[in-house]
A protein has these predicted regions:
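Solvent-exposed interaction patches of small proteins and small membrane subunits
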Residues: 1-118
Length: 118
């Protein structure tokens, strides 16, 4: 599989994760605070989004140069390696506010990639 197909697949995976993120966030902060499964799901989302951000920046550092990609990767590293220090308020903010900001970046990258192919 060539690099372009891998990138397309990773962007598709990221779209799916962002949809799942949106669905979980819609449950609300009160559910997040009372359902012990939701913070764990948020940690898993941070892990997966950050892992994809790492793959995308490694595959094409010029296209995936926006600092939000590296922030997602660093968040992943923190959540995975410092899980005992994860602050629930910061985790909520990250999944509620920061991760959704990747969606317009994905749309912009897709427009750019379609233009480059045409």
């Amino acid at each position: 599989m060539n690099a372009d197909k891998r990138i397309d697949g990773w962007l598709h995976d990221l779209d799916r994760l962002l949809d799942q993120t949106e669905s979980l966030v819609k449950r609300g902060r009160a559910s997040y605070d009372t359902d012990p499964a939701l913070p764990l799901a948020f940690e898993a989302l941070c892990n997966r989004v950050g892992d994809l951000a790492k793959k995308l920046t490694a595959a094409d550092a010029v296209t995936f140069v926006d600092t939000r990609w590296s922030q997602a990767a660093r968040t992943r590293d923190f959540v995975v390696h410092q899980y005992h220090r994860v602050d629930s308020d910061v985790l909520w903010e990250t999944v509620h506010t920061s991760i959704p900001k990747l969606r317009p970046l994905i749309a912009e990258i897709r427009r750019h990639r379609r233009g480059a192919v045409s």
